[in-house]
C-alpha cells in the first residue's frame, strides 16, 4: 500500500471511484464521510483541495481530502482494521484538524491514538411529523418588513442589488464562522451552482424603509436545501442569518418559520439543520421549536 498525493479533479475516473467509495461508506455507517464541499472538491479544482490516497494496485483504499489544515478522511468499508487510517493521518501536514462525521467509534479511536482532542462540535438537529407541522404554523409576518424569494427579489430589485445585499448580510451574520464567513460574489455563485439549488428556496427578509423609490435593505435570509435524492425526501435549513442591525428584534423566528412552511409545501415530513454545539442560545431556541439532536460531527486536533 502506498500513500499518494493526487489532484483528483484532474482525473474524473479517479473522482468517480472516490465518490463510489464514499457512497459505500455512507451506506455502511449511516453518515456521509465527506461533507458537501469536500465532495464538490473532488471535481471542482477551484476549491483548491489536495488529496492523499491510500492505493494498493489500482484500488483506492482510503482518502484524505485537505483544505488548508482542515481534513476529511475515511477508509473504505472492506479495508478497515488494516492501519490505513493511521497511515493517512501520519502523511498529513503538521497540526491537522480532522473532521469525524458522526464521530463514530473508529474515528474516535484513531484520533485518541494520535493524542487528539475534540476542538469543535457541530450538531445536526431535526424536526419532523407533528412537531414540524406545529412549528410551521407560527406567524411569519413582521411589521414593516416582507419576505420574498430570490426570484421575486431579482424581478423587483435587480440581481446586482439582491446578491450584493445577500453577501453583505451573510458576512455580517457569519463574521466568526470558518466556512460561511468572508464570502464574495464568486463564492456565492459557486454555491448557487449546486445541482439542488432552487431560487424559490431562498427567502429574503427586506426592509423598504426608504419607500418605493429607494433600494431596500436586506434584514436577513433563509437559504433552504431540498434533499430530493433521499427517500423520503426532506428539507434542510441550509443557512439562515440576520444582518447586524436587525439582531435582537425577534426576526429569526418568522424567517425560520417561513422556510419550514416552504419545505412542508414541497412535501417534507422532516427538516434538519446544522448548528455549532457551543452556540447554546441557538440550540435552546431550536429545541423550543421542536428540533432535537440527530447527529454529532466533531473536529479532532492535537492540543496546544
Swiss-Prot record:
Acetyl-CoA 2 binds at residues 240-242, 279-284. Signal peptide: none annotated. Keywords: Acyltransferase, Repeat, Transferase. Coiled coil: none annotated. Acetyl-CoA 1 binds at residues 73-75. It catalyses: 1D-myo-inositol 2-(L-cysteinylamino)-2-deoxy-alpha-D-glucopyranoside + acetyl-CoA = mycothiol + CoA + H(+). InterPro entries: Acyl_CoA_acyltransferase, GNAT_dom, Mycothiol_AcTrfase. Disulfide bonds: none annotated. The keyword Repressor does not apply. Transmembrane segments: none annotated. It comes from the Bacteria. GO terms for molecular function: mycothiol synthase activity. 1D-myo-inositol 2-(L-cysteinylamino)-2-deoxy-alpha-D-glucopyranoside binds at residues 36, 179, 225, 236, 274. Belongs to the acetyltransferase family. MshD subfamily. Monomer. Catalyzes the transfer of acetyl from acetyl-CoA to desacetylmycothiol (Cys-GlcN-Ins) to form mycothiol. This is Mycothiol acetyltransferase. It comes from Corynebacterium aurimucosum (strain ATCC 700975 / DSM 44827 / CIP 107346 / CN-1). The gene is mshD.
